[in-house]
Amino acid sequence: MKSRYIITIICLSVLLVAIYFNWKYEVVAINLIGGEEDSELKVMTWNVHCSEGADIIRQRKIAEIILNEDADFVQLNEYNLDSCTVIDSLLKIKYPFTEEYQSHQICGDIFYSKRQMTNSGHVWIPIQGKSIQTIKATIRVASDSVQILGVHMASNHYDGIAFEKEFQSDTTSYEKYKYAQESRSFQAHWTKKAILESKHPVIVMGDMNDFNSSPPLDTLMSCGLKDSWWEGGNGYGSTYHDCWMLLRIDHILYSKELKLKSVKVKDTDLSGHNPVVAGFSVSK
């Protein structure tokens, strides 16, 4: 009888610890929101891994997914406009307004919008020789405007196979992760300044290459932003898949003035990342 009591206490303790860490680090979301509720603003972010282009069939499939989602505003990471002409020509029919940033010769980020954008451009980040950039645009929604900031934060530069090799050879991928995290934190710091200066509700989205409760995410969320998946998703919601690694590193963060109506991660094998889609109500 005593041993059963001890086992029960241990199991309850483990459960409470697991619940605490899940709450603290926002790992597995549990929410009642579900389905596709009507929204005034629907946004989508996706790292399409097209920095060096893609074959025509893959480009058409990528465009088809985006068009079928019918978001009002789309951000694509690792996108080269010069070599993704098929995607661009198909999207331009529905999304006539664009804002592009090409961080270096083969890689960039782009906004596609149904609505005209104002105050578009780049957030000033005082660093040279680095492909660190946050793009921005303001769009009119209902009786208000929303400031959208698109980020693609520094990668850790390893995939599942490389990580396994480093682990086996006793070199530490953690050091590589922390080095890249410093760059992400730097970008988050200057993006935070843009958030605080905004006169409108803000959405920050993109491939952030980091997890909830990491320093870069904490910096952004210290402005009062909420994570759409944690607030409205269900389950782990992995957005990155490579070999055995399943990570949630693509995020849509939003101001408390916006009301989250829906959020989902769409499974696809067209990229190493899955697109994240969220719908919001803007009217007060």
Model-predicted regions and their roles:
Residues 16, 21-33, 55, 64-67, ...:
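Structured beta-strand-rich core segments of catalytic domains in phosphoester-bond hydrolases
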Residues 34-40:
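Membrane-proximal juxtamembrane linkers immediately C-terminal to transmembrane helices
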Residues 41-48, 62-85, 137, 148-151, ...:
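Active-site beta-strand/loop signature of hydrolases that rely on acidic residues for catalysis
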Residues 45-59, 157-181:
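Acidic/histidine-rich helix-loop elements
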